[in-house]
Amino acid sequence: MKSQWKKLGLAGMAGVLALSAQLAGAKELTVGYVAAGMQYPFNVAAARGFEAAAKEAGVKAVVLDAKTSVERQGNAVDDLIAQKVDGIAVLPIDAVVAQSWVDRAAARNIPVVAVATQIGDPQKHSIKDVYPKLAGLVASDEVRAGADAAQIAARLLPKDRVAKIAIVEGAPGYPTVWQATKGFKDGLEKAGIKYQIVASQPTDWTPEQGESVCQNILTAHPDVDLFYNQADDMVIGCARAVRAAGSHAKLVSRGGSKLGINAVKTGDVDGTVCIQPGKMGRLAFKTLYAAITNPGAPKGKFVDVDTPQVTKTSLSACVPEW
């Protein structure tokens, strides 16, 4: 009997030693996150969500800031590849250029997850048609978000004549700009709204540019009925321009930021669509971690983050994350 216990004890000890050796030899995972520009609250929220999820999982996260430079973002991805990180998440500035970065990482068996923005030409591929070399894409369907904004707008626009609409775009190069515009127009047509786009101008995603663009549009088209801003930051500036001009133009936006939700609450903005960058960041890490720990998992996964509409009567639909 003693001999049997001794054998069991030795076997147990051997198991413990084997497990200890395995743990000692286990590699600490390191993942990289490349932001488009940390001067934007949206980007900060997405990066923080990613970092928080990585910390909870005991994974080291390296966050790099491209400062809105496509070249700098590409170099950051290349640096992470050279460092042989276990995985990379990126919020791409230029969706088409970013395709080559994903190709280079895939050639070295480093999984990549795109955050908020698809990889590839949005005019040739729907957002759900995920670039096959990506481990996954975590984003909101921006065409749907544009249609959500159109539903809000349709309730505000005149029905007895052609409505005059101006679009305040985001920065050139972002696929979101084209997707949000397409969704908005499709949504208006589905609602049976007769409309004319009297102006559509790009910005740099800032309140200052939003105000400047709206001032210029109001000068050229003082009778504009509605401004569709493609981010809450711009709509804050646009609201200032509308008030200063004494205009009665309605304001619809996209974002769900703290500033945007508060502007809806106070009545300065008529409605917005809730985008959740923090949630995207957290889900991006989860998707990347799954790809790292299960290399055989299917690639090209689309993780859709919903986009609830927010008006004065539905403020609780969105918890601001940026």
Where are each of the predicted segments found?
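Bacterial N-terminal signal peptides that target proteins for export
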Residues: M1-G12
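Sec/Tat signal peptide C-region and signal peptidase I cleavage site
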Residues: L19-A26
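Extracytoplasmic "Venus flytrap"
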Residues: T30-A57, V62-D79, Q83-V85, V90-A95, ...
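Hydrophobic alpha-helical segments within soluble ligand-binding/sensing domains
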Residues: Q73, A135-A163, G210, G256-G260, ...
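Hydrophobic alpha-helical
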Residues: I93-A107, G183-F184, V198-N262
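Flexible loop/hinge segments that line or gate small-molecule binding clefts
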Residues: W101-R144, K164, S257-K265, V269-D270
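Hinge/cleft segment of the Venus flytrap/periplasmic-binding protein
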Residues: K124, V168, P172, A191, ...
